């Protein structure tokens, strides 16, 4: 059986798994977000696709557990502002930037790469040209 590993030559893919605690010349120790790593790699390699994988199949307009919530098929700066305002209202803290940090990096990445936010189940479709999730455009 052909796997994703066999379909794409290693030099053509750059997996990014997660951020980590790192040394920082100014701060001593800091968090290096996996989203920031993706942004830097996308700016350098300029891939066709940049795909953020998360637990949900895209960016939702509300709580993903709520059956009334829907996926935004397109996330732009207006949607990002709306979600940022909602995030500030909930006062949830995530040192890695959470969804808002991911969207902000994705917006920048969309200048150099077709950028998506989706889940692991949708990933293989991208290799066959079947995109799904939330497309991010600046």
Regions found by a protein language model. Name each.
Residues 1-138:
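C-terminal catalytic "cap/lid" subdomain
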């Amino acid at each position: 059986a052909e796997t994703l590993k066999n379909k794409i030559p290693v030099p053509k893919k750059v997996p990014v798994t997660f951020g980590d605690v790192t040394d920082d010349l100014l701060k001593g120790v800091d968090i290096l977000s996996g989203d920031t790593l993706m942004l830097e790699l996308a700016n350098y390699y300029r891939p066709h696709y940049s795909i953020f994988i998360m637990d949900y199949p895209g960016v939702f307009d509300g709580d993903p557990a709520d059956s009334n919530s829907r996926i935004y098929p397109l996330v732009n700066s207006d949607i990002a502002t709306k979600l940022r305002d909602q995030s500030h209202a909930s006062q949830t803290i995530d040192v890695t930037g959470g969804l808002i940090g991911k969207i902000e990096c994705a917006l920048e990445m969309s200048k150099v790469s077709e950028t998506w936010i989706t889940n692991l189940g949708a990933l293989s479709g991208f290799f066959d040209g079947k995109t799904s999730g939330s497309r991010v455009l600046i």
